[in-house]
Amino acid sequence: MSDYKSTLNLPETGFPMRGDLAKREPGMLARWTDDDLYGIIRAAKKGKKTFILHDGPPYANGSIHIGHSVNKILKDIIVKSKGLSGYDSPYVPGWDCHGLPIELKVEQEYGKPGEKFTAAEFRAKCREYAATQVDGQRKDFIRLGVLGDWSHPYLTMDFKTEANIIRALGKIIGNGHLHKGAKPVHWCVDCRSALAEAEVEYYDKTSPSIDVAFQAVDQDALKAKFAVSNVNGPISLVIWTTTPWTLPANRAISIAPDFDYALVQIDGQAVILAKDLVESVMQRIGVTDYTILGTVKGAELELLRFTHPFMGFDVPAILGDHVTLDAGTGAVHTAPGHGPDDYVIGQKYGLETANPVGPDGTYLPGTYPTLDGVNVFKANDIVVALLQEKGALLHVEKMQHSYPCCWRHKTPIIFRATPQWFVSMDQKGLRAQSLKEIKGVQWIPDWGQARIESMVANRPDWCISRQRTWGVPMSLFVHKDTEELHPRTLELMEEVAKRVEVDGIQAWWDLDAKEILGDEADQYVKVPDTLDVWFDSGSTHSSVVDVRPEFAGHAADMYLEGSDQHRGWFMSSLMISTAMKGKAPYRQVLTHGFTVDGQGRKMSKSIGNTVSPQDVMNKLGADILRLWVASTDYTGEMAVSDEILKRAADSYRRIRNTARFLLANLNGFDPAKDMVKPEEMVVLDRWAVGCAKAAQEDILKAYEAYDFHEVVQRLMRFCSVEMGSFYLDIIKDRQYTAKADSVARRSCQTALYHIAEALVRWMAPILSFTADEVWGYLPGEREKYVFTGEWYEGLFGLADSEAMNDAFWDELLKVRGEVNKVIEQARADKKVGGSLEAAVTLYAEPELAAKLTALGDELRFVLLTSGATVADYHDAPADAQQSEVLKGLKVALSKAEGEKCPRCWHYTQDVGKVAEHAEICGRCVSNVAGDGEKRKFA
């Protein structure tokens, strides 16, 4: 028996079946770095229209986590897809490098500034620490396959950036948005200093817990609100607090707009409480006989006035989201000078930020006769006695609770309003202009707009000053007596910025005021405050985007971060850009959700459900992580677990196998010589290229809309359904058995070539490593990297006017599906082994019959059977299977007649008819020794 294997065109490629991504990707990365792939892309895209995605800087502290990976991968997918869409899309990664977390790390290792080190040495250590953190994170980001200018990132601690941050503040001052005010901060009376959040520890402390009645000014108005008239005694709103010493600074009572508040009659008076807390309050104050007279929503009580029990003035009821039903009365004593929530709501309602307490923790003169000069922690008993005397105390008891203490002295601390610098939301119309700018931005998802609008509408002035060591100095001089800014402030800030550009922020602390103020130096002092780190990152549209040469003066098109950044970077950037330039710093803002585990739980080390991106890359490879990110709808929470990543790996295999099939069957194909013109191609091959064209239209639309999960779904449908279960199945016979250089085979290879050229580009933004690998195995002359080109433009399809158009092949797909069902049943019944052992008769209504007949003998190749005939629908025997999908079709199956050809495996009547090739069929003889078979349709 002759061996005809050598006469077959068997698939062959060096492209491996297994991805082995974890092992292969580092080698590819090394090549990308050695070749300067990012630089190659920039050179290729020079002069094209720009798309600038400005990187929100992660904080330079700690290893990257799965959330960082999601963020950087989404950005990379956009940048690469924009490049393929014909844009020059430079990507400059950045890092946020100043601020408290870095200070704390350095303090833990070296001690506080001024202890073992000077402040200057401390800043140098902070700079050093931040640089090592940047290096660690950069390696992991590069490993993800993210392309960017990693050799020249922007750091907020770059001298030039620090200088430009100072210039940004100067511009805001010049536009009239800065003012000085007071804001409550953690204050240690022993240190006589403000404390950062991280310098606060919590210990148990015993304090008096009191319920206090504030009597209504207009009793009749309250009766009307509750629609009651028969009230016995005065009406009061009851607050509960564990800090009686703050009552002299009370300026309002906060209630919740949506809670139900009850008017409760007790002995000789009526009190207002949250309805859900009535029972617990009555138990606490020892009242058993009470009646609820009526209820209203908290919003109904807004701005009604109540009398302070001992300070001699009225205070309003105001609405606040910070009010809870966890404890107390549902009405919160509000002292804007002694608490952050109180301060924020106080700003909203224009309340006085009263601060009757000095830096040593004693009441200032003129506070109240029995309190002046008394330490606040010794004043609680005095205040309780005062309330009792005034008849306003409903209840007092001792209560143990967790209380903030100084980490150095272990003593209780207070909130105390201190002078700070603010960007005003309203003095020059910043709020109104920002709200206007928001409307001109595209928010993705669109609910982001309402979210940030509400935040801007309700936010207080922005406190931008900090009393820290490692930060950009405010670089201001104020008059010793008047505390007014120097009249030449903008000029002086520019002088400071020039020095910082050369020597970094230390230049400010080294500066002797005389150097730039001359004789005026004696009248002015340097402001010691640094800027809030959100000012650093929020001004990068100016300090980075406006000055980097690759951005060529273009503003950012997109900001992309997690949904928590509406109140973070998106907000600070909007405030600063609008205050500086009168416009938003971005055209589009895209937000993604947070990562959760497979059960939807938040990632937590204590639960043990975190997924480490480093582990995923080391086990599965970065492309699997990238595919998971792309295939997840980022607009909501993004679930990740080993099981979910395994599913991503399964999808990856399907795509890789499709790519491998294409490459293996392009063996020996030279597009320059072997390409078949579209009009000479087999119709089914043109249909397949048309499928790729339709898929490309959908995929490009999805990339344009940033719907990456739609890209993945469409890619999977193309690989699995349109190619895998139909076209690639059908062409194997022609591809393997036809004459190597025949039109029948070259037509097929032409289609595979066009499909591969398109597919590799669709993959590139998401499966970057695999696309690069595929690119290296594609035949024909090409650029070195897929990332420098654009979407493939060589696709074409069938015209609707053709008889065998897309609709024709759609119907054929259905027919084949029905035939497959019959074959599967016959296999289950052991009537046939495989589909080539079968011959089918299709009993069809005239319209369908005409289509099937048009394929002639090639119908059997579409159906993957050894025989296929078409007959009249009404001649179908009783055992013919009625199609459920096509009403005018019945299918009958019989065992194929003739012998099995060992070369093509078809059963035919003409095996052995040619003496020289006695073992194979006539078609194979023609393909081996003759002119080769001709195919027109399939």
UniProtKB/Swiss-Prot annotation:
<keyword id="KW-0862">Zinc</keyword>
<keyword id="KW-0067">ATP-binding</keyword>
<dbReference type="GO" id="GO:0006428">
    <property type="term" value="P:isoleucyl-tRNA aminoacylation"/>
</dbReference>
<feature type="short sequence motif" description="'HIGH' region">
    <location>
        <begin position="58"/>
        <end position="68"/>
    </location>
</feature>
<dbReference type="GO" id="GO:0000049">
    <property type="term" value="F:tRNA binding"/>
</dbReference>
<feature type="binding site">
    <location>
        <position position="921"/>
    </location>
    <ligand>
        <name>Zn(2+)</name>
    </ligand>
</feature>
<feature type="binding site">
    <location>
        <position position="605"/>
    </location>
    <ligand>
        <name>ATP</name>
    </ligand>
</feature>
<dbReference type="InterPro" id="IPR010663">
    <property type="entry name" value="Znf_FPG/IleRS"/>
</dbReference>
<dbReference type="InterPro" id="IPR001412">
    <property type="entry name" value="aa-tRNA-synth_I_CS"/>
</dbReference>
<keyword id="KW-0436">Ligase</keyword>
<dbReference type="GO" id="GO:0004822">
    <property type="term" value="F:isoleucine-tRNA ligase activity"/>
</dbReference>
<feature type="modified residue" description="N6-acetyllysine">
    <location>
        <position position="183"/>
    </location>
</feature>
<keyword id="KW-0547">Nucleotide-binding</keyword>
<dbReference type="InterPro" id="IPR013155">
    <property type="entry name" value="M/V/L/I-tRNA-synth_anticd-bd"/>
</dbReference>
<keyword id="KW-0648">Protein biosynthesis</keyword>
<feature type="binding site">
    <location>
        <position position="901"/>
    </location>
    <ligand>
        <name>Zn(2+)</name>
    </ligand>
</feature>
<dbReference type="InterPro" id="IPR002301">
    <property type="entry name" value="Ile-tRNA-ligase"/>
</dbReference>
<keyword id="KW-0963">Cytoplasm</keyword>
<protein>
    <recommendedName>
        <fullName>Isoleucine--tRNA ligase</fullName>
        <ecNumber>6.1.1.5</ecNumber>
    </recommendedName>
</protein>
<dbReference type="GO" id="GO:0005524">
    <property type="term" value="F:ATP binding"/>
</dbReference>
<keyword id="KW-0479">Metal-binding</keyword>
<dbReference type="Pfam" id="PF06827">
    <property type="entry name" value="zf-FPG_IleRS"/>
</dbReference>
<dbReference type="Pfam" id="PF00133">
    <property type="entry name" value="tRNA-synt_1"/>
</dbReference>
<dbReference type="InterPro" id="IPR023585">
    <property type="entry name" value="Ile-tRNA-ligase_type1"/>
</dbReference>
<feature type="short sequence motif" description="'KMSKS' region">
    <location>
        <begin position="602"/>
        <end position="606"/>
    </location>
</feature>
<dbReference type="InterPro" id="IPR009008">
    <property type="entry name" value="Val/Leu/Ile-tRNA-synth_edit"/>
</dbReference>
<keyword id="KW-0007">Acetylation</keyword>
<feature type="binding site">
    <location>
        <position position="561"/>
    </location>
    <ligand>
        <name>L-isoleucyl-5'-AMP</name>
    </ligand>
</feature>
<dbReference type="GO" id="GO:0005829">
    <property type="term" value="C:cytosol"/>
</dbReference>
<comment type="function">
    <text>Catalyzes the attachment of isoleucine to tRNA(Ile). As IleRS can inadvertently accommodate and process structurally similar amino acids such as valine, to avoid such errors it has two additional distinct tRNA(Ile)-dependent editing activities. One activity is designated as 'pretransfer' editing and involves the hydrolysis of activated Val-AMP. The other activity is designated 'posttransfer' editing and involves deacylation of mischarged Val-tRNA(Ile).</text>
</comment>
<comment type="subunit">
    <text>Monomer.</text>
</comment>
<comment type="similarity">
    <text>Belongs to the class-I aminoacyl-tRNA synthetase family. IleS type 1 subfamily.</text>
</comment>
<dbReference type="InterPro" id="IPR014729">
    <property type="entry name" value="Rossmann-like_a/b/a_fold"/>
</dbReference>
<dbReference type="InterPro" id="IPR033708">
    <property type="entry name" value="Anticodon_Ile_BEm"/>
</dbReference>
<dbReference type="Pfam" id="PF08264">
    <property type="entry name" value="Anticodon_1"/>
</dbReference>
<dbReference type="GO" id="GO:0002161">
    <property type="term" value="F:aminoacyl-tRNA deacylase activity"/>
</dbReference>
<dbReference type="InterPro" id="IPR002300">
    <property type="entry name" value="aa-tRNA-synth_Ia"/>
</dbReference>
<dbReference type="InterPro" id="IPR050081">
    <property type="entry name" value="Ile-tRNA_ligase"/>
</dbReference>
<keyword id="KW-0030">Aminoacyl-tRNA synthetase</keyword>
<dbReference type="GO" id="GO:0008270">
    <property type="term" value="F:zinc ion binding"/>
</dbReference>
<feature type="binding site">
    <location>
        <position position="904"/>
    </location>
    <ligand>
        <name>Zn(2+)</name>
    </ligand>
</feature>
<dbReference type="InterPro" id="IPR009080">
    <property type="entry name" value="tRNAsynth_Ia_anticodon-bd"/>
</dbReference>
